[in-house]
Amino acid sequence: MSFCLTELYLWSLKNNLHIGDEDVGVHQYHEKKEAALHPDYGFLEEKQQWMESRGFPWILKNKRPEKLRDNLTELEELMQSSECVLSKWKNKYVCQLLFGSGVLVSISLSGPQLEKVVIDRSLVGKLISNPISDAIFTDSFIILSFLKENKLCLIQFTKKINSPDINRQLDKLSLLDLKISYTDIPGPKGRHLVRHLAINSMQDLALCWWPVPVDDVKPWSPVSSEKDRANLVLLSNSSCKLEVLSYIRTEGDLLNACFSINQPYQICTVEHSLNSNKEPMADRFIYECVRNKIQCVSVTRVPLRSRVISCAVNTSEDKLVLGCEDSSLILYESDCKVTLLAQADLLPDLIRWHPNGTIFVVASSQGELQIFDMALSPIRAQILAEEIEPNSTIQVCKQFNVSSTLVEMHWAAPHTLLQNMDMTDIYNLLYLRFDGGPIGVLQLKLGAICRGQLGAMEIISQYIRHDEVDEAVGLLSSMNWNTMGHQCFTSMTAIVNHLLRQRLTPDREAQLEASLGTFYSPTRPLLDTIVLQYRDPISRYARRFFHHLLRYQRFEKAFLLAVDIGARDLFMDIHYLALDKGELALAKVARKKAEEIDAESINSGVEPLLPTDTLADVNEAFVDLSLIPQVEDRILGSFPSTDLGAHNSIQRNANRQLVHIENEIGIEVYAESLDKSLPWNQECFEEDFAEENPEGIGSLKVVHFGLV
């Protein structure tokens, strides 16, 4: 059973969290002589020694000029007295927190541990309106929105810091010579609205949006206007000022709005609406900025069973996850128009995709977490403990005493670099913020085998390692060959090799078909370059599957696969094996099919795949297949009985997932390439046959294309 091991690091000095001394996977900072304050905890000293032996501080130092312990205490007091409106990762080592009062806190990390905390009050008292609703931080400016005012504030830095030194990036704003300006925006006046902000990757367009209030002014009201009813505002950021370009009123209730990562002048929104039958829907709108106007380009409507409360889009923007009030999760794949449904074990208040787009985390406001892969298969996890007890959810709230709700969750990765992210870098920290504190990170312990990565290949390898083949095949089916060709091929070969090493059962047969079907019968059309690059090596795995079927006398499925491959030698293999087993009708049909392929080759001027002499040698090499051990006969009895002549068309269509491959994608089979010993298959073949025939008695030799 595969599962993910985690550790929870809370950046807190409070002694009322009541973290147990036996909870080896939950950590916080402590005061000196704290053991005397908790006489019931008899293992605090041992836990301290264990933490310090791993290089993690138990007691924070308070040396000047950092004064880390004092600054952390001040940060915790600030979280109690003021609302944190934004948590943004400048890079994977620096997190910035902005409070409604204008206080900016920068946190520098070393792994999951605090290294430096800088509290900046440069903006306090310099803004005309409080409190702050949302903010955008860049290296050259800041944009602020407010709860009580229809205004946006632009703060420009006349001095820039381009130093890669993290300590220089934590300098206070007062050193950057701030220039502050304001811009009025449309929207209802005199309303307290949480106005959200977004900016495109070019940083020349900004977006301000807010959900429609419950008691909103009706469209037929004489006091309302289009400007007052707007809830989506597009602004330009040029010439050192913000300027309103366009504004609209969305059709549904806005759940999220942002600029596309890949298309900087496209706006993507997710809206909640009702259809004509008053049933809930989730609408995904794509808007474009054309001549400084917002124009709708496309609309995708996803029917739901209950109201949507959260959503998230992956970095490649082809998968949208929706969380609903009934704890259901809907995954919509835009490129192949497929919708998947799963049931979460918690209320999905927050959803966050991992930067590489393979997994996402769902969280409830009570502090429960659940991990899913992009095929909606749940990944079990647990916080480090003495006993191995993985569960479907991580109960963070039960690890310490906290009465507040989980309000924010992010991966420790900068949003601006997601489109150019280095996939070899490690992103294993999940930032958690509870209302009023504490804050901290959940670290995923991925181990040396996965190299700290959370990619599709690493997760599939873990699935295979624990014999969870259905989950591995499901994840492979969700991968895109056109953009992840190497990962798809590596994952597919790993699954197929794993299955071919084992005895054939109905489940494994279906898994082999599904794995090869991701290439031969894809849900989305494959690019010609992908087909040309991978068709030859994958056709060899299809041949191995054919002989695996033949080995277990799955004549019908082997015949259908031979039709798809279109090779004469495969039909001759069926012919001689059927003769040996007394299946004269099948032998006759297979021989006839081989002769048809021969005739087509002669008419088209193409030489047969194998010379006649070679075929004669192969035929003489066959031995009596009655020597196969009786245990395999018992396995064959578990398969449904098939009759090639009486097989109905419905069953044939259901079983043929690899139909007309040669006609559809132009696969050509060359005997000279297949006769060669393949370096990546030779080991697998030797291991397979050594495993199945340890004594070498009463079994067959490898005489032709892996046939036993």
Swiss-Prot record:
Probable effector of the planar cell polarity signaling pathway which regulates the septin cytoskeleton in both ciliogenesis and collective cell movements including covergent extension during gastrulation. Controls cell shape but not polarization during convergent extension. Proposed to function as core component of the CPLANE (ciliogenesis and planar polarity effectors) complex involved in the recruitment of peripheral IFT-A proteins to basal bodies. This is WD repeat-containing and planar cell polarity effector protein fritz homolog. Disulfide bonds: none annotated. It comes from the Eukaryota. PANTHER family: HOMOLOC-13, WD REPEAT-CONTAINING AND PLANAR CELL POLARITY EFFECTOR PROTEIN FRITZ HOMOLOG. It comes from Xenopus laevis (African clawed frog). One of its GO terms (cellular component) is plasma membrane. Belongs to the WD repeat fritz family. Interacts with sept2-a. Interacts with intu and fuz; fuz, intu and wdpcp probably form the core CPLANE (ciliogenesis and planar polarity effectors) complex. InterPro entries: Frtz, WD40_repeat_dom_sf. Keywords: Cell membrane, Cell projection, Cilium, Cilium biogenesis/degradation, Cytoplasm, Cytoskeleton, Membrane, Repeat, WD repeat. The keyword Transferase does not apply. WD repeats lie at residues 303-342, 343-382.
